Amino acid sequence: TERSDEGLENSKSLWRKKNKAVWLLYAGLTLLFAYGSSRGYMHYDTGLYHAQAIRWIEEYGVVPGLANLHSRFGYNSASFALSAFFSETWLIGRPMHCVAGFFALLCACKCAAGLMAFWKRKKVRISDFLSIGGIFYLIAVFREMVSPASDYFAMLVLFWVIMTWVELWEQERDCPIGEKQTVPYALLSLYLVYAATVKLSTAVILLLVLYPAVLLLRQKKWLQIAGYIALGLLIAFPYLARNVLISGWLFYPFTFL
């Protein structure tokens, strides 16, 4: 009994040390990306229209016909509204474009968690390569994530979603169809809808939505299907409404709608 109690205490002590090391790693990443979000180089398009579009939203909200003043304002992005909301200009007298850095931090924590899981299981999976790819992308954009460019927002959201998606798939790929989870994939699909409102060119990734859709249809979860469709429309509606008000088109610069 004494030996078992001693072994239990040793296990608890080891777990606390590992847990403390993980939290220290995340704290270090937070400081690193806070530093990266405070200085660096601006994306060319930020000087051209990103920063101005965000400032327009800060000062006036949605301005009908704004794309007539500058055609680039028609490239509406959900990231601009998010950046305007968290710019906190009133606090220091100038905007703090730090949301891209926060998204980068989330992606970095996801990559770190993936690599720690690899170190623990000592077995290579597809998700491990995605974690390495995410780290390379973060290194590439580190000096420019101070810029509120929609390109960075979209890529960071996609990296996070795809890494999470593949990890889920790896965990249950041998499960029968009826036992596969639907909620995590459906919720990740809502993030993909948001990514499409950040950068319209990412809309092709919405094809992944077919996977949870098929699972839900096979399991005949009609109420959940209706709920997820409603949430997707709720996410997309503000973006579509701003498009119509700013440019007159539903999907600028495409003029067929």
Protein language model features and the residues they cover:
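Perimembrane helix-loop-helix junctions
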Residues: 6-8, 205-233
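Short hydrophobic alpha-helices at membrane interfaces in multi-pass membrane enzymes
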Residues: 168-194
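Active-site lumenal/periplasmic loops and adjacent helix-entry segments of GT-C-fold
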Residues: 33-127, 145-147
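Alpha-helical transmembrane segments of multi-pass membrane proteins
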Residues: 105, 132-136, 152-163, 185-188, ...
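Multi-pass, polyprenyl lipid-linked donor-dependent membrane glycosyltransferases
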Residues: 98-102, 119, 140-172
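Membrane-interface alpha helices of multi-pass inner-membrane proteins
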Residues: 142-143, 184-200, 204-211, 234, ...
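Membrane-lumen/periplasm interface segments of specific transmembrane helices
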Residues: 38-41, 82, 225-257
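Membrane-embedded, hydrophobic transmembrane alpha-helices
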Residues: 1-13
